[in-house]
Amino acid sequence: MKVIKGLMAGLFFLLLCACGGQQIKDPLNYEVEPFTFQNQDGKNVSLESLKGEVWLADFIFTNCETICPPMTAHMTELQKKLKAENIDVRIVSFSVDPENDKPKQLKKFAANYPLSFDNWDFLTGYSQSDIEAFALKSFKAIVKKPEGEDQVIHQSSFYLVGPNGKVLKDYNGVENTPYDDIIADVKTASTLK
């Protein structure tokens, strides 16, 4: 009888360990560099202010003629789905055209979507070279504004950033956006320290 009780206790312990050890599968672990930028209301948002929070990021610009509208529509849908499940997550959209995307312009752009600013910041307040370097170093994302052009080349991914400021995953933000996978990963990331 003691052997059975011992086996049951051991099995129970293993089950508890397995349930508490959720991990992000194949995390990217890119370190986001410290930043302090302005949001659509002219308020500062920094990596420090996001510390301890799970957040989603993308790169957009308001004059975009191709991928930014569907990306913003998909992020809006994701925001709605996360809210419906009472999942607390911040969303950060970095402008890749800071010369043209001042806070007022970002707010006007966002008004085209049924989104909430409660947990979503559209950021600007840096130079073109700064955002190009920041995107590459922090997200391994290409951002490039060709000379004399009004369109900017940039990644179309959504990025999941953990509470430790590391990029954990990236997802397609334009087509077949994997909402369920993102939501599951956000839930898992919320348990990480």
Regions picked out by a protein language model, each given a short descriptive name:
Residues 120, 132, 139-144, 153-159:
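Structural micro-motif
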Residues 1-8:
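Bacterial N-terminal signal peptides that target proteins for export
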Residues 32-33, 54-55, 155-157:
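Short loop/turn microsegments at loop-to-beta-strand junctions
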Residues 73-134:
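Structural microenvironment flanking redox-active thiols in thiol-disulfide oxidoreductases
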Residues 14-18:
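C-terminal motif of bacterial Sec signal peptides marking the signal peptidase cleavage site
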Residues 21-48, 73:
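N-terminal "domain-start" segment that seeds a small globular fold
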Residues 146-193:
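Thiol-/selenol-based redox modules, centered on thioredoxin-like
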Residues 46-69, 75, 92:
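Short active-site neighborhood of thiol/selenol oxidoreductases, capturing the structured segment around
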